[in-house]
């Protein structure tokens, strides 16, 4: 059985790590490289970096910090932000990233998923999905441009259908960003994760809602996700990654210590 992954997420804006609540009101957390180094030393299995305004600003992630991160950590890391072409992805991978993640650009041009998978292999291609539960309709809807409050908008895709579509096109992994839970620390949306897990046959990473160690255990054991991504609990040192891994091992979760 493959070990479950713990994945700190660093949202990047203007060269600094920031964190919002439900994708709004971002506060500055600190500099990218020292945080990345700290998480790697604490025992993170992987890191994810989102340049959160790259897509809405119509630019590609700033590559200068990608190279600096690659120099100081020895764990895999994934980079997202405005990657719209094979050339964009190639440059980020050349700078040292192990994977690229696409979100809004995949919604604008679904064929991009296939192009990237064909060129770099599916293991390099992650699709991020920003999913919002609309209480009025009772549906999970995919959103676009969520890094910019003024431009974020619903798409025509329901989450389950988009999960099926991106797999068909070559996604090697899916990160499900559950917008209603983001930064609230009340736990991952297990109902939504189970709905997606039923139709997701590639590694699935839960994102949005981690507040306590038990939330990680629940995601692994009750929704069978492959990894759990979190930001604020790590940034604010509410949870230490080494201690979290020890706790998960005691809960009989397969984890790398």
UniProtKB/Swiss-Prot annotation:
Catalytic activity, reaction form: 5-[(5-phospho-1-deoxy-D-ribulos-1-ylimino)methylamino]-1-(5-phospho-beta-D-ribosyl)imidazole-4-carboxamide + L-glutamine = D-erythro-1-(imidazol-4-yl)glycerol 3-phosphate + 5-amino-1-(5-phospho-beta-D-ribosyl)imidazole-4-carboxamide + L-glutamate + H(+)
Pfam families documented for this protein: His_biosynth
A GO molecular-function descriptor: imidazoleglycerol-phosphate synthase activity
Recorded GO CC terms: cytoplasm
Subunit structure: Heterodimer of HisH and HisF.
Recorded family membership: Belongs to the HisA/HisF family.
Listed name of the protein: Imidazole glycerol phosphate synthase subunit HisF
Originating species: Photobacterium profundum (strain SS9)
Gene, per the UniProt record: hisF
